Amino acid sequence: MAAAPVFFPSSVVVSVYRAHGYAFSCSSLLSQLPAIKLSSYRPTRTDHTAITLLPNSNRIASRLQAMQSPTFEVNGDGKTEEVEKLQKGIAEFYDESSGIWEEIWGDHMHHGFYDPGTTVSLADHRTAQIRMIEEALRFASVSDDPMKKPKRIVDVGCGIGGSSRYFARKYDAECKGITLSPVQAKRAQALAVAEGLQGTVSFEVADALAQPFPHGQFDLVWSMESGEHMPDKEKFVRELVRVAAPGATIIIVTWCHRDLSPSEHSLKPQEQKLLNKICDSYYLPAWCSTADYVKILESLFLEDIKRADWSEYVAPFWPAVIRSALTWKGFTSLIRSGWKTIKGAMVMPLMIEGFKKDVIKFSVITCRKPE
């Protein structure tokens, strides 16, 4: 009789079976790995991976079980209560704050890319946000050649659709954007119609961890500053890879914490305390490092993996956001917007502190899905 499969979280399976070591310490299990047979990946409601245990491997099963994260109630859609609460907070935060952002900063809801040490005006900041898009495309070697340029693009965590509309014009491409915020999706679509792009750009409310698209649909998968909101980084990356067509480029621009040294198992307590304060106001789950992202990509056999720290190139951004909040227009808009936006404004100095102390890194990670 065939052994019954036992289900464990995918992150545990990858950590133990491939011995990458991120998030778990599993060196003591390496000598016993031959007793574990990894079955083909079969996603379930809770995104667990099946392991078929061979004879005399109960002890391994119990040790794997002990390595799991605390369990939570799983709802009918496969989400834990904790994830549902987080995503509800994210949606409400952006429902509340997107209007004030657009009014002051325009339709690109992300950092700008600046030459180090420069002094810039608000108009320069908007130019810098476009430059951020172009620099990320250049870093990933996305071609402008009419025969090679992307034709189908997904914007994961699209905000009010600034990147999507930019791509539609730049590449004459079909773009789809997803966001947790109904207010953002509605505004993004309205702007697309106003710009005559309704035939090529569309937006919807959807979960980046369970994207509403078939496998292999897009030849450019774009995530600009949305990864930091993802409670399961491995599942997030798996979804980016799943919807990518063979040969597609994947671009992740995101906030990370610094890489840990070989002797470290976690951030220092004062560093973690700083990040926790930011998480509370911006509805962020636990942070990861750029190295963590790279390990996930390597485990999925992605090609041409590249990474860079662009922290010095975004340094003028947060001081500029604070200055805009202290203008009369910014202050009155902030008060009208609501408590979640006010809380976010109050921790902006902590973002500056995190960058200055090298705890926070502004990271770009790119790769290509094999043909």
UniProtKB/Swiss-Prot annotation:
Enzyme Commission code: 2.1.1.-
Annotated stretches, region: SAM motif III: 243-252
CDD domains in UniProt: AdoMet_MTases
Keywords: Alkaloid metabolism, Chloroplast, Membrane, Methyltransferase, Plastid, Plastid inner membrane, S-adenosyl-L-methionine, Transferase, Transit peptide
Matching Pfam families: Methyltransf_11
Transit peptide: first to last position: 1-65
Catalytic activity: picrinine + S-adenosyl-L-methionine = ervincine + S-adenosyl-L-homocysteine + H(+)
Localization (cell): Plastid, Chloroplast inner membrane
Keyword Repressor: no
Superkingdom classification of source: Eukaryota
GO MF terms, alphabetically ordered: S-adenosylmethionine-dependent methyltransferase activity
Pathway, per record: Alkaloid biosynthesis; vindoline biosynthesis
Coiled-coil features, chain-numbered ranges: none
Region of interest (SAM motif II), residue spans: 216-224
Region (SAM motif I) location: 153-162
EC category name: transferase
GO CC term, one of those recorded: chloroplast inner membrane
Self-association and partners: Homodimer.
Family that this chain belongs to: Belongs to the class I-like SAM-binding methyltransferase superfamily. gTMT family.
Name used for this protein in its record: Gamma-tocopherol methyltransferase, chloroplastic
Gene that encodes it: TMT3
